[in-house]
Structures are given as structure tokens and as C-alpha cells.
Amino acid sequence: RTSAATLARVLATMYSNPKFQGAIQGLPVGGVSGTLIHRFVKTAPQAVGLVQAKTGSINGVVSLAGFVDSGDRKYAFAIITDRLRHTYKIESAARATIDKLLGKIAAPMQIVTATDVAPSPSPEASAN
């Protein structure tokens, strides 16, 4: 058995090692590609394109592990639900809950422009 915390630490370590960049870049993107193409679209649309992760499931377990962008940061995460009753409805609800949780964290990077940093002085202000 592996804990979610251990899995998240492994992902964070991989992220900081250039040898693993190909594996990280190959992760499916929420609402965009792979096994996550239909995830987040209805459950947490604000997270579409901001979650890169791998799904996992066996009877009674639903999991998602990867990275979520939040502003100018990227967080490694691992969420593992366990001991679920093995029904489509319950496992779908677990996936939706995971999506909504990540939707609370996900945020696009804010682009700062020169006008956001310092407004131009008005001609009247520079004349005084």
C-alpha cells in the first residue's frame, strides 16, 4: 500500500528532475486529452486545461494523481478514495467530488502587463 502523501511527494520529486519531464508532459490534461478528456468539463469547468493527472481505479477505489496549476504555482497532488461500494453511481460521484475539489484549487496564471504595474501619469500631474 502507498499513501496519497507518498505518491504526491514522488510526483513533486519527479517534477523537479529534468529526466522525468517527458513523463510529466505526457500526462492527460483535464477536459483536453486522454483519460481526462471528459473530466472537469461539467463538474469543474474552471479546472479544464489546468490539471495534468493519471486516473486509477480498481473495485472500490477511485484515484487521481498529478499536478494542478493555481496561479503562478503548480501543485503535486494525489487523491485516493477507498472502500467505495463498487457501483457506477458511487464511483462517478467520487470522481465528481475529486474534480470539484481540484476546481477549488485550479486557477489560471495571471498575466501582469506594464499598465497593471504602474499607471501612466496624467499630463496634468506631470505639469505640476
Could you say what each language-model-derived stretch is?
Residues 1-128:
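Small-residue-rich helix-loop
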